[in-house]
C-alpha cells in the first residue's frame, strides 16, 4: 500500500479516536442513568479506532524510516484542529493557525524525501 495512503489512514483513525475520547468526556454531563453506558460506547469506538491506527502504523514503519514517518504524524494536529472546530465549535486563535500552517509546511518539506 502507498505510504501516503497509509499515513492518511493512520491520521484519520487517530483523529477519530481523539474525537471519540472527547465525546466520552462530554458524556459525563448526561444524567447519571445514561452516563456510564454512553461513555463506555464512545470509549470502545475510540479503542477500536486507535487500535486499527496502531496496526496500520506498524505497517507504515515497514515502509518508511521512523525518522521520516513519525514527524509526518504531525498531520494529526491539523486534522484534530479542523475537526474540533467542525464538531465542537472550538475556536482557534491566529497563533494556533500559524502553528498549523508551520506544521503543514514541515510536512511538505518532509514529503519531498518520500
From Swiss-Prot:
<keyword id="KW-1133">Transmembrane helix</keyword>
<feature type="domain" description="EamA">
    <location>
        <begin position="43"/>
        <end position="112"/>
    </location>
</feature>
<comment type="function">
    <text>Translocates 4-amino-4-deoxy-L-arabinose-phosphoundecaprenol (alpha-L-Ara4N-phosphoundecaprenol) from the cytoplasmic to the periplasmic side of the inner membrane.</text>
</comment>
<keyword id="KW-0813">Transport</keyword>
<comment type="similarity">
    <text>Belongs to the ArnE family.</text>
</comment>
<comment type="pathway">
    <text>Bacterial outer membrane biogenesis; lipopolysaccharide biosynthesis.</text>
</comment>
<keyword id="KW-0441">Lipid A biosynthesis</keyword>
<dbReference type="GO" id="GO:1901505">
    <property type="term" value="F:carbohydrate derivative transmembrane transporter activity"/>
</dbReference>
<keyword id="KW-0472">Membrane</keyword>
<keyword id="KW-0812">Transmembrane</keyword>
<keyword id="KW-1003">Cell membrane</keyword>
<keyword id="KW-0448">Lipopolysaccharide biosynthesis</keyword>
<keyword id="KW-0997">Cell inner membrane</keyword>
<feature type="transmembrane region" description="Helical">
    <location>
        <begin position="94"/>
        <end position="114"/>
    </location>
</feature>
<keyword id="KW-0444">Lipid biosynthesis</keyword>
<dbReference type="GO" id="GO:0005886">
    <property type="term" value="C:plasma membrane"/>
</dbReference>
<feature type="transmembrane region" description="Helical">
    <location>
        <begin position="38"/>
        <end position="58"/>
    </location>
</feature>
<dbReference type="GO" id="GO:0009103">
    <property type="term" value="P:lipopolysaccharide biosynthetic process"/>
</dbReference>
<protein>
    <recommendedName>
        <fullName>Probable 4-amino-4-deoxy-L-arabinose-phosphoundecaprenol flippase subunit ArnE</fullName>
    </recommendedName>
</protein>
<dbReference type="InterPro" id="IPR000390">
    <property type="entry name" value="Small_drug/metabolite_transptr"/>
</dbReference>
<dbReference type="Pfam" id="PF00892">
    <property type="entry name" value="EamA"/>
</dbReference>
<dbReference type="GO" id="GO:0009245">
    <property type="term" value="P:lipid A biosynthetic process"/>
</dbReference>
<keyword id="KW-0443">Lipid metabolism</keyword>
<dbReference type="InterPro" id="IPR000620">
    <property type="entry name" value="EamA_dom"/>
</dbReference>
<feature type="transmembrane region" description="Helical">
    <location>
        <begin position="64"/>
        <end position="84"/>
    </location>
</feature>
<comment type="subunit">
    <text>Heterodimer of ArnE and ArnF.</text>
</comment>
<dbReference type="InterPro" id="IPR022883">
    <property type="entry name" value="Flippase_ArnE"/>
</dbReference>
